[in-house]
Amino acid sequence: HLSLRRQRQMCIRDSDNVCHVVGKDILRFHAIYWPIMLMALDIPIRFKLYVHGWILTKDGKMSKSKGNAVYPMDLIDRFGIDAVRYYLAKELPLGNDGLFSYERFIERYNFELANDLGNLVSRSISMINKYCDGVVPNKDIVKSGEYEQSLCEVANKAITKTIACFDKFRIQDGIGETWQLIKRANKYIDETAPWVLAKDDNKREELASVMYHLAESLRIIAILIAPYLVAVSYTHLRAHET
């Protein structure tokens, strides 16, 4: 149990990092009543409010009586918590209501998580295992050509813009910026065709350079997706360390 004095000290010290995540229907309690109480206690008002909308279905608000309620645990049991977290982050933008439908959920799961991200991770890791014995090549052998420069530009842009979006709680936009890098990395595989380079002994260094750029892309992506794809990010960052 924290004393009132201790709570006050923590509130003042950490208030710049405090964010209230609330639904729009209880905004007044956090935007009006809570600041009044802080002012009465002479505590600075420096917290942030992240106010999200409602999660709707095509029939409107979810209701048990209507029989259109979606139970999160059922989704988590079937698809995993990361997939549910990703969908909500993508479909519930700041300041607006979000729409949930099983069709839309499956579409995002298949096309974005499985096809875009999943294929990139699977292809990259399998090629690093096959062509480099599972060891990421040393940075010293890296060569930078037209494709590598383009990939690096997209990566740097994704880092800057994703962080900027997240700092402003524009989670949906931040995810979109990260996905630009994911799509570019997938394109990089097609452009460089590592399976062709692997057939030519004179292209070993070029192949190693491609593998390095793919591994580095995965590392950056793993960091950027960490807020909403926690398990995926942790798994691949640990794999990268190993």
Annotate each PLM feature.
Residues E91, N96, R104-I141, L151-R238:
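Helix-rich, typically C-terminal accessory recognition domains appended to large enzymatic cores
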Residues H1-R8, I12, H236-A239:
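Single conserved hydrophobic/aromatic residue that forms the stacking wall/gate
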Residues H1-L4, I81, N119:
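General helical secondary-structure elements
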Residues H1, L27, E148, R204-L207:
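Flexible, glycine- and charge-enriched loops at secondary-structure boundaries
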Residues R6-Q9, R13-Y102:
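Alpha-helical recognition segments enriched in aromatics with Gly/Pro capping
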